[in-house]
């Protein structure tokens, strides 16, 4: 049996039921019987809005029938729009990273330019949306010359696990960070205060221009963690007094930052950089040869032998990796705890010059000029 097309009278019935407290308790047939006499007494002018609404509904129905859908019922056109938006966002991110590095280079402050690295652990991910429930947060402030100057780390107790996700959360915790689940989770329970404190710490390095024009805070993480970091910041922001701060944190790809820095530094010292690409820098991060360094994780993950998954260890290792592959080209001496873990000996020596950008700094047995 063919489905009846929307008509003006039924549009009126739906509107009457929505606006009439008595009508909400009636069935459709009862509402039709009640509205019949009212409809008959209405003029063409009064019926006009309902005729327009019915016409619009018929047009939308015809369009939906001709629209191609995928298996879950999502229109291909909508998927294409989302794909184009993602491509545009990635291109904008790359342009902004290049602009940041170029600005620091032109002002002769590339070595002092500070970058913020952020990582999250999570308990579970919602099945029907891009929502990650945060479990641990760490961030560090990094520059080529000073290495890691400060770090921020905290565990998070959201109070409860997303309904129906306890088993998934247990599996994820057991195979990764091994943090106890809510309500027995460790760390901060007031997520609103935690978000405010985190935003305050991240904003501490903003210069006068950033404060004057209310520029967003830019943080960097790995491509795999970008959706996690974005979602966890949104989760914390929703618990705050206001959501207006959510737009103040932008998450960028640390691998592309690494690529941009490396190519820029090689150009500065006159070394060809054509062989450098995103696949090379991604392989450096996947190699992660500081993964098993001791003394860089939080006390809890050191105790349970899960230092690899500790967010504090992650952000410190990212700083160490960038230092390892770039500082030698700029003749910057590696300082323990700032550029490398305290027990690691770097594989090159630096001959001091008038400036760390001077080319009389030499690198031996390091392979920096080759990468």
UniProtKB/Swiss-Prot annotation:
It is found in: Cytoplasm; Nucleus. One of its GO terms (biological process) is male meiotic nuclear division. Keywords: Cytoplasm, Developmental protein, Differentiation, DNA-binding, Meiosis, Nucleus, Oogenesis, Repressor, RNA-mediated gene silencing, Transcription, Transcription regulation. Its main location: cytoplasm. SUPFAM superfamilies: HMG-box (SSF47095). GO terms for molecular function: transcription cis-regulatory region binding. It holds the Pfam family Maelstrom. Gene3D superfamilies: High mobility group box domain. Residues 2-68 bind DNA. One of its GO terms (cellular component) is nucleus. Belongs to the maelstrom family. Involved both in the piRNA and miRNA metabolic processes. As a component of the meiotic nuage, plays a central role during oogenesis by repressing transposable elements and preventing their mobilization, which is essential for the germline integrity. Repression of transposable elements is mediated via the piRNA metabolic process, which mediates the repression of transposable elements during meiosis by forming complexes composed of piRNAs and Piwi proteins and governs the repression of transposons. PANTHER family: PROTEIN MAELSTROM HOMOLOG (PTHR21358:SF4). This is Protein maelstrom 1. It comes from Drosophila pseudoobscura pseudoobscura (Fruit fly). The gene is mael1.
